[in-house]
Amino acid sequence: MVDWDEQIKAHLFWVWNEGESFFKRGREGMLVITDKRLAFITKTEMSYKMHETHSIRQAKRFEAGENVFRPAEGYKLEHLERDLDKSPDNLEILFSQIIDITSEEKRWGTLLKVKVNLGDRSKVYKFSIAKGWLKYPAKDPMGFQKMDWSPLINLVKTSSST
């Protein structure tokens, strides 16, 4: 259900969610950040052309050193709700479920680690932004961006404390 006070704060494309184990592959998706939750969308109703346009804009912003934490024009809360309903593979994490959120500098890029309370257990999700894609034999990232995740980390921490 849409909370009309909720707003999309940022929409990141080419996000890689690491696999849970050595044998489980990671997945590509979009990370949609509102002021109440994170959503990792792997199956979307967004058109290929619109996705490609926003992905290219994001890549250019990385190259120019600009802020990439911004909403995608034309993608509203209603679209997010439809995408979340579209597939059980799409992931929704309420800020109230987040136990810890940190970033980790790696040699190859910057990793966002989100530890989530799932009731009887906790789980760590690991996200990073891909620079490009290798499409054969399976889609895999060619490299990862080095980035500052602190705007997202600060949003989650300040929202959780209120």
Protein language model features and the residues they cover:
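Structural motif
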Residues: 36-37
